[in-house]
Amino acid sequence: MTDRDKAEIFIDEPRRRTPVAGRYDVIVCGGGPAGTAAAVRAAENGASVLLLERQGSLGGTWTGSLMTWLMDVENKSGLLDRLTDGICSLGSLYCRQHGDYSFCPEDMKCVMEQMAVEAGVSLLYHTMLAGVITEVPQGGGVPAVKGVITESKSRRQAFLAPVIVDATGDGDAAAMAGCSFFMGEEGTGRMQPMSMIALVCGLSVRDVRPFCLNYESCPGEAQRHFQELFASCGIRLSYSMPVLTHLKGDLFSVSLNHEYQVPCDDARQITDAVIRARAEVLGALHKLAAADKRWESAIIAHTADAIGVREGRRIRGNYTVTREDLISGRTFEDGICDVTFNVDIHVSGKTGSGSWDDGGVCVKPYQIPLRALIAADVRGLVLAGRLISGDFYAHASYRTGGNILKIGEAAGVLAAAAARTGVAPDEVPFDVVREVLGSGIGT
């Protein structure tokens, strides 16, 4: 490659007029667990809501990335109860250790979609966020959101709303709007690995029961047995504690892959990680089928449409949840989610020992305040999901499914209240949010 090839080359695009395709009270960017919860709650509280999703279904990490188990679900009533009831009615909800749940991703897609439609949410699939429209007040000050720009089969369009919820997972909307953010561990920059999960069918539950998290008698037992099985067949994995979960009938999910130090904002590196990950997953399972009779009838039904991302941008909010908050078990007057999950930091490199560590943090039950869901740098922008304002260690605790759903609910209630009353999210009285979310939050 020549120096000229290495130099940045730009193209000046012609100025263009983008048609406004709709006006709403609230626009939610991202239809994962947090985004769906935010959209449903906002719509149920009187807001007109547009939910934008780049894939063809709701659920995000739970469905597109096949993360088929829910953790930290205690004290998370509300939408979680409605979701689990719906999935249970379809016959795919299994209780795991410590009260966690596993589920069939197709059932989750159906239940979440029906929930959104019944709430009156306007869904727009196969739509990419291309920009966030902001406006600086006359005389200067903090910019305010006015809408978003999208790209899809309908070409380039604009949608307007006074309140936007960023539920993209990686904080794409906030970054486009000019918000400051953090990535990785403070001081080192290390980031948690990505993972490719697969669905496997054709197995006998009786034959693989010792390897299933659903049926283990003590934490970690099934993963150790599963790792020993691969090792006995001469198969070395990038993830030293592989996971097998029974979902429904003869359907299982398998997680055995780690992709290290892949930034969430680099499409080339993510693509390379996906190619490596899929090759490892397919190769390992084919070798296992050839080496162990219990696995010879296994059929790899599906690999995830999107590689699972544990960590991306963490957007600066009006409060940042910290390691110290976890250690002290801090509660807040505006607490919206009770978190009990440990710090779960998957090793950041192949040379690491074990599969995860707690960073030396002993977590006491703590709360996430509503202020951590309000972007500090842009007016009208609400944060939902793992991208809320927190440090590396706090994020490694609250990023699990039960918490993400509850954070999404609070974001939706806040967004609807702000849009209805014509004020900024940080001007909405917390009692308004508390009243809708119900008991069990706050101090």
Give residue ranges: language-model regions.
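Conserved N-terminal/central alpha/beta ligand/cofactor-binding core
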Residues: T2-A7, R15, R23, R41, ...
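Flavin (FAD/FMN)-binding glycine-rich loop and adjacent Rossmann-like elements that form
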Residues: T2-E8, R16-R17, T61, G140-V142, ...
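Beta1/beta-strand and adjacent pyrophosphate-binding region of the FAD-binding site
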Residues: V20-G32
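Membrane-embedded transmembrane-helix bundle of lipid-linked glycan/lipid transferases
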Residues: I27-C29, A38, A43
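N-terminal Rossmann-fold NAD(P) dinucleotide-binding loop
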Residues: G35
